[in-house]
Amino acid sequence: MKASQERSEARRTAHSVKEKKYMVMASPRKRPRDLEAEKAALWLEPSARLCLLNPPEMVTILLHHYAAEVSTSRQYRGGDFKGEPAFRFSPHLDPTVNRFIHPVSVLENPLAVSHTLLLHHGGLAMCPRFVAFTENRSKFPAAQYELFTVIFNEARVPIPQRVTEWLATLSPEEKTTVRILNWSGTTFEDQLELTERVLRSWADFSEYQLPSRHLSEFVTLKDSLRGYTDSSGHQYYHAKMDSVDETGVVYRVNLTRASIPRRFTLIVCHGTVAVTAVPVELTEDTFYKWLADDGDDGDGDDDGDDDGDDDGGDDDDE
């Protein structure tokens, strides 16, 4: 047995020496570079996903925009690769989007399906741990996937009861993977800062490198977005989907009296890409009726891009 161990040790030593000699004699093009080693390490990291519970629509749009900007085609074993693994996040609204997991839901609840399309471009939008609790009262193995969950709590709006019930079932260890972010500002600048807070919380929590890379990339992108926004003068508001019928998805838009223009452009988007722009001009009757209705009914969310003469509702619709 001792002789066998000595032979094994000798083989390992010889192999190590051979590797070192190869590294010294190899051409510079074949030597592993630090950047390539770093990328390889990122590829070997366990799966990680950022989960958002009740996020503002603009935060979802900004993260989709970031994901589209940094997405690259890549391979790992068996081919060259470029960039890092994809940025993956799951936005989820409770209780509107809750049963899109099963195909039968398309017929049972078209409102929920359309809202899912609005927020996730046709993909599966869910917070796995929360959905597992609400659907089956079961636990999803968060530690296996490092699911970092951010709960958005709007000012003066209580956290939904089902969310608090779910939080009460978490163990002390599981609670370390959950953050509650309070927010109130609805301007584009406010939403940019809120999105950065989300990614920074994830980077501070995670023991892996990818979340920090996502944060630094978004900060760079955020600076360019801020400059673009300032030059365009657009303002973004929240939208509330009112109904779905044979003509499509209907969104309810409530604006204050001071922000309702007579002429504006409704911009229909798929994700962050404008699909079509429809100019609208309100007549006297329509304009003043809208003002009266707005004064009588104070609930609902706002949606639009108000740039002085133009005000466009930025709806993600398919």
UniProtKB/Swiss-Prot annotation:
Ranges for region Disordered: 1-29, 293-318
Basic and acidic residues bias locations: 1-22
Protein name as it appears in the record: Uncharacterized protein ORF18
Upper lineage: Viruses, Duplodnaviria, Heunggongvirae, Peploviricota, Herviviricetes
GN (gene name): ORF18
